[in-house]
Every structure is written in structure tokens, then in C-alpha cells.
């Protein structure tokens, strides 16, 4: 009986995927790729132009942006590269 109960608990944990965390890229502009673990369920990539040229910011979540700033949000690991 204990074995059956333990088996059910393990199967439940595996099926629910408890503890899953999303990973998003967080490098800026043309820097080498870096990844961070996120509590949010999405990643973002913001783009805008300034006197240096096109700027890119990546991270976790899906923030609000000002007019003139491009925003792409996505929901799979490292989808914002």
C-alpha cells in the first residue's frame, strides 16, 4: 500500500511538472548570449533606435513599452534570442 501511494505521488509530480521554471535570454543588443531563470511565464525582446543605432533588450515577463519601442513576447524557453 505504501509503495502504491509513493508511486502515485511520484507520477503526480512528474505529470504536473512542479518546479518548472522558464528560461529567457537576457543579453543586451549584440552581446554574447546569456540565459536567466524566470518566475514569469514569458520572455520579451524590446527594440528601439537611438544615436548608437538599434538597441535590443531581452528579459523575463512582458513589460509595457513606450510608443516607438518594438516589443515581442513569447512563451517558450529562450524564445527571445
UniProtKB/Swiss-Prot annotation:
Function: Binds to muscle nicotinic acetylcholine receptor (nAChR) and inhibit acetylcholine from binding to the receptor, thereby impairing neuromuscular transmission.
Predominant location category: secreted
Superkingdom of this protein's organism: Eukaryota
Name of this chain's protein: Short neurotoxin 2
An MF annotation (GO) of this entry: ion channel regulator activity
SUPFAM superfamilies the UniProt entry points to: Snake toxin-like
InterPro entries on file: Snake_3FTx, Snake_toxin-like_sf, Snake_toxin_con_site, Toxin_cobra-type
Disulphide bond pairs: 24-43, 38-60, 62-73, 74-79
Amino acid at each position: 500500500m505504501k509503495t502504491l501511494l509513493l508511486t502515485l505521488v511520484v507520477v503526480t509530480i512528474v505529470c504536473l511538472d512542479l518546479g518548472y521554471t522558464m528560461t529567457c535570454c537576457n543579453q543586451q543588443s549584440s552581446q554574447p548570449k546569456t540565459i536567466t531563470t524566470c518566475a514569469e511565464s514569458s520572455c520579451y525582446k524590446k527594440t528601439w533606435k537611438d544615436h548608437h543605432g538599434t538597441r535590443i533588450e531581452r528579459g523575463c515577463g512582458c513589460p509595457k513599452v513606450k510608443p516607438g519601442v518594438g516589443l515581442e513576447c513569447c512563451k517558450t524557453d529562450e524564445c527571445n534570442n
